[in-house]
From Swiss-Prot:
Keyword line: Ribonucleoprotein, Ribosomal protein
UniProt organism field: Babesia bovis
UniProt GO BP: maturation of LSU-rRNA from tricistronic rRNA transcript (SSU-rRNA, 5.8S rRNA, LSU-rRNA); translation
Keyword Ribosomal protein: yes
Keyword Secreted: no
Record protein name field: Large ribosomal subunit protein uL29
UniProt cross-references to InterPro entries, sorted A to Z: Ribosomal_uL29, Ribosomal_uL29_CS, Ribosomal_uL29_euk, Ribosomal_uL29_sf
Gene name as annotated: RPL35
An annotated GO cellular component: cytosolic large ribosomal subunit
Length: 123
């Protein structure tokens, strides 16, 4: 078994990915049985390669599913927590840009009645 290239996996359909995942899992199970029963280590080094291949297939499949789910939530204001961008705790609690630019009535009146003075120098 040779290493699986991720760019090749991205070209496959979901059904093909699931079929390949099933095949890899069966092969992995048979390798583990071989590891216990047979003492020769000729193909046992392939266990790591198969495990990594399974991880790659699952990664591509899950990324695709998450992208589809993200497209569904583009028009909805509330998004599930696991779909939101990963931010620090402080950034999650920070004010939104709209909230930052809001002014109180008193502050607005003060700005209207006493605008910032502009000076121009004649040269």
């Amino acid at each position: 078994m040779e290493k699986i290239k991720v760019y090749e996996l991205r070209n496959k359909t979901d059904a093909e990915l699931l079929k390949q995942l099933e095949d890899l899992k069966q092969e992995y199970a048979s390798m583990r049985v071989q590891k216990v029963t047979v003492t020769s280590t000729s193909k046992l080094s392939q266990i790591g390669v198969i495990r990594k291949a399974i991880a790659k297939v699952l990664t591509v499949y899950n990324q695709r599913k998450r992208e589809e789910a993200r497209k569904q939530y583009t028009k909805i204001s509330e998004m599930p927590l696991n779909m939101r961008p990963k931010l620090t705790r402080a950034k999650r609690r920070a004010l939104t840009p709209k909230q930052l630019h809001l002014k109180t009535i008193k502050q607005r009146k003060k700005c209207e009645n006493f605008p910032k003075r502009k000076y121009a120098l004649l040269v």
